[in-house]
Amino acid sequence: MGIICEIVGSCCNKRYNLGYNYPFIFGLKNLGNTCFMNSSLQCIFNSNKLIKKLENIHIKKNPKLRLANEISLMLNDIKKGQIFIDPKNIKDILGEVEEKYKYFEQNDANEFITIFLNELLKELNGIGEYKTENIPKDELEKKAFNKLEDKFFNKNKSFLLNLFYGRLKRQYICENGHICAIKFNNFNTLILPHPEDSNDIVDLLKVYQKNKSIDDTIFCNTCQSEKKYSIKTLIYNIPDYFILCLEKETIYSYSGLKYPKILETKDFTNNSSKYSLNSFIIYIGDRERGHYTAKCEKNNNWYHFSDANYKIIEENNIHDKNAIILFYEKI
């Protein structure tokens, strides 16, 4: 028998059978300025592939998997009918990683997401399969690719890599247009610039990949001398969940972000994949004080989560000009 719960807000007095199926619907207790954490967790837990993977591993048999075990316990509580969850233990675990999470001050949601995923990755090292994708054929690129593979991906092998971790390719280009060096870096959230002439997410992704001049020189093997150079950053691999954030310095002044329900990677990369908007985080406030909430798609309905409270919303009310972090899921 499924869980029966009342959805408050725009559809009050209606009751919905939420069942035991993914994704789960629940509120999170605000422990004191922890809306940044609650909204982040709502979006992360809306990643169905992650939840299904965690449920299929023997978490409780491994005491080292503290964060994964806490997620498992929370999901078990939801299955038993709880629709109000206390995330204190998750906060305490991350407080041992980052001291600021021991306290009750407002923090940045995008930073929390990065730290949460990195800590979960450490715990899940060696658990599940990891598939290497898009190995380059060019020898210079392949050498740089394998360097990151050995340094990061092979040392953190886990199913979490394909879900949340992508690769950036950085080309170091001299003033005469020669590629002097190539480096690969990993990412789990992509922090985008916000140019004054556009607020469209696809435009921001294009600007992110433009050449950026560096006030320095680099040795160019082709020119056989030190040359001024620029760096071109390319989005090389995109994981199953593509997390996009606005730069911290610009979220207080922009006029509203435009983002599609379906994001096509061919519009900003050489790859052709489609991603569907899975959830996103909203911030209303200024640098000193504000409130984070989340909107998530669950069972073909959209919900707005504000800590312990949540409500179902109409599809034409999904878009929000105050969105600052977007979660896209590969279709």
What are these regions (language model features)?
Residues 2-23, 44, 53, 57-63, ...:
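Exposed substrate/partner-binding surface patches
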Residues 21-25, 98-101:
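Glycine- and acidic
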Residues 22, 26-45, 127-140:
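Short N-terminal secondary-structure initiator segments
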Residues 27, 32, 63, 67-70, ...:
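Generic detector of ordered secondary-structure context
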Residues 28-43, 70, 104-115, 289-292, ...:
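Active-site nucleophilic cysteine motif
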Residues 35, 174, 244:
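Carboxylate-rich, divalent-cation-coordinating active-site regions
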Residues 46, 50-186:
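Papain-like cysteine protease catalytic cores
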